[in-house]
Amino acid sequence: MPSQSPYHALSRYFSFPNRDHQAWWTGKGPLLGNMLADAGYPEQQQYQYLTLFNLHLIPALGPSESHGAGIDGAEWKSLLSGSGKLEFSMTYRKSAVSLRIAFEPTSLLAGTKKDVFNKRRTQQLLGDLERLDIDIDTVLYHPLFDTLVVSDEEEAALQNAGTVIPDSSRTQQLLALNLIEGNVRADLYVYPYVKALATGTASSTLLWAAVKKIDRYNRFRDALSILKGYFETYPSSTTNPMFLSSDLAAPRNAFCRLFFSETNFSWERVQHLWTLGGTLSDKPTLKGLELAKILWDILGISTAPASPDSFPLLFTFELRPEQPYLRQKLGIPVSGLTESAIANACVAFFERLGWDDHAASYRTNLSAY
């Protein structure tokens, strides 16, 4: 008898409490199983992570994409990169590939009068995950929630004022679970847009305050001073503070990242923002900029300004307790490119880096999804 994949083996013994649960499992489980196998996870870990997905994550995904609306016909639209409420992605390093599950915890109540801005489900899920044998510490969750998520009173004030908030801007919290060597590292993403509307406080002010709130040991003081100083010195109408992320770890070990969108697609602007106007000139910064330029050229990025309905560039600044105090990343939108063009660009980039194994397997793996 031919051996079954972990997904098919588990499917024989899982029961489903409702049709949404079954739809999520049959719709997304095979993809997760294939990606785990292609990334080289040992079979035992494939069973582990598929079980985690079925038993603990699917109940926090809310109505399935095929069934749509929740209670009272409410249909929650997540902010998650235009891909719906759930996203699987791979992180490539020279000698390894790891998987990431990003999603907005959601319930049937999301978008109804009982949970207008889908605030409740994330905290409930984190409580469930804390009871598992994985490395999650939620001590930083509460100060981030209090600083960046609307309170019940602020929520009521927005409703009473008749404030119109687009569906795509209602998301306030996302989770990403990084699947690493049989363990899970959880990252929390918090968006202050709704809080800024409710309080009349600029998103940047809320984000700076949130960093200070979770920085109990002044680990990010120097990094924050450099970053804040740049944006005060070089204000730009094309750059906007977007959100903050922190891993859910002990405060002495947790990282903090700040994200900024950029609608100016000129390479000169990328250089200026990446180096913070020349303030950052250390070797890791310049090497990262060099690699970003290689990918930029391979993709053939247009220098035209982003249109209102297109995705901007996304800059990430990770705050660090030692030099170099900031570590940058650049997210380049690929909307408008075909999957074939994107795959060819990734393969070409891997080849430039000398990552021959990744270059050889990337197209084949992608075509299977």
Swiss-Prot record:
Q: Which domain of life is it from?
A: Eukaryota
Tell me the GO molecular function terms: prenyltransferase activity
- Biotechnological utility: Malbrancheamides have the ability to inhibit calmodulin, calmodulin-dependent phosphodiesterase (PDE1), and induce both endothelium-independent and endothelium-dependent relaxant effects, suggesting their potential as vasorelaxant agents.
Q: Which UniProt keywords apply?
A: Prenyltransferase, Transferase
**Disulphide linkage map:** none
Function, as annotated: Prenyltransferase; part of the gene cluster that mediates the biosynthesis of malbrancheamide, a dichlorinated fungal indole alkaloid that belongs to a family of natural products containing a characteristic bicyclo[2.2.2]diazaoctane core. The first step of malbrancheamide biosynthesis involves coupling of L-proline and L-tryptophan by malG, a bimodular NRPS, to produce L-Pro-L-Trp aldehyde through reductive offloading.
Q: Family membership, please give it.
A: Belongs to the tryptophan dimethylallyltransferase family.
Protein name in the entry: Prenyltransferase malB
Q: Which organism is it from?
A: Malbranchea aurantiaca
- Tell me the gene name: malB
